[in-house]
């Protein structure tokens, strides 16, 4: 949620941000008007309550013969106070409802526009060259006995798979490599809940216009998370933190996404699935340190890409493709040989105080007051990375060379061999 002070004092900042996102600029003006009405309602309530308190003292001190009439007046006044309180509460709810529709103000320099309007910041590693026709990750996975889409569909439906044998071992190895990288950089590991309450899902910004992407268990009123970011953001809800140094967490979880808007996209293999595993970095820090921490998260992601021998690029995501919570997001995309293009493997977002303000996660300032912390997140490994690893390191016979950094996590295995070879 945005800062009401920013709304009142710098509405043009929000107007420019909304315009860059392709969202309604009118929401800012609506919020300003509702804020005026809210403050007027609160003032009216507080004045009536002060009058009620003063009248109560008068009743207490009045002679006995006057009290009956004064008590009747006090009861009438109490009714007016209650009514004013209800009006103020309704105005507060309207204001919060409008505020929640306004996206996080984007950081200066974020490109305007939609999904295709990103800026390429760098490209690392050359395009892999093969002296043969490369196989895609599913063909390789089937040769290796590593990916079974048919039985995944039989058991659970489209966009589900079994990772078996070398596939299961490869994912576990990848996740453990990422976990060790996180530990080396001071992250505390957590295995997080994958079911969360509505207020936590709402607080992180995942129940807005894309709520149809989320699985909801209606009977229990719980949501399946598409990232451990949600649980990690809720971990310190309603708390006052010491963020003299950043609090860094690495959440390991199974993730679930409905992919409601992805009909016909990436229907082959495990690029876009309903269930996957992910190791997510999540940081609480001081707002003034958020941009520097964002750069660190990106650097750690790049270290992982380089450790796995993947060619990649980094893009600065355009404002209209950020989602409501992020003020800036970098995507790291790996080259997928059989598609002849880069595909997103990971992203990292600076959410500023947007999530913390909703979830009441605060720190104490030097003056002793409390203020919302900044939150950031970034993926360090996920199931989709297997796609790039298999395709990049494949050999003509269908075997796959294991990146050196993964070998200790696979018992020293250097080559993934096709079944029966």
Curated annotation (Swiss-Prot):
Consists of two distinct domains, a catalytic core and a N-terminal extension that is involved in tRNA binding. L-serine binds at residues 227-229, 280, 379. Keywords: Aminoacyl-tRNA synthetase, ATP-binding, Cytoplasm, Ligase, Nucleotide-binding, Protein biosynthesis. Catalyzes the attachment of serine to tRNA(Ser). Is also able to aminoacylate tRNA(Sec) with serine, to form the misacylated tRNA L-seryl-tRNA(Sec), which will be further converted into selenocysteinyl-tRNA(Sec). InterPro entries: aa-tRNA-synt_IIb, aa-tRNA-synth_II, aa-tRNA-synth_II/BPL/LPL, Ser-tRNA-ligase_type_1, Ser-tRNA-synth_1_N, SerRS_1_N_sf, SerRS_core, tRNA-bd_arm. It comes from Leifsonia xyli subsp. xyli (strain CTCB07). Belongs to the class-II aminoacyl-tRNA synthetase family. Type-1 seryl-tRNA synthetase subfamily. This is Serine--tRNA ligase. HAMAP family: Ser_tRNA_synth_type1. It is an enzyme of class 6 (ligase). PANTHER family: SERYL-TRNA SYNTHETASE (PTHR11778). ATP binds at residues 257-259, 273, 344-347. Pathway: Aminoacyl-tRNA biosynthesis; selenocysteinyl-tRNA(Sec) biosynthesis; L-seryl-tRNA(Sec) from L-serine and tRNA(Sec): step 1/1. GO terms for cellular component: cytoplasm. It holds the Pfam family Seryl_tRNA_N. One of its GO terms (molecular function) is ATP binding. One of its GO terms (biological process) is selenocysteine biosynthetic process. Its EC number is 6.1.1.11. It is found in: Cytoplasm. It catalyses: tRNA(Ser) + L-serine + ATP = L-seryl-tRNA(Ser) + AMP + diphosphate + H(+); tRNA(Sec) + L-serine + ATP = L-seryl-tRNA(Sec) + AMP + diphosphate + H(+). The gene is serS. Homodimer. The tRNA molecule binds across the dimer. Its main location: cytoplasm.
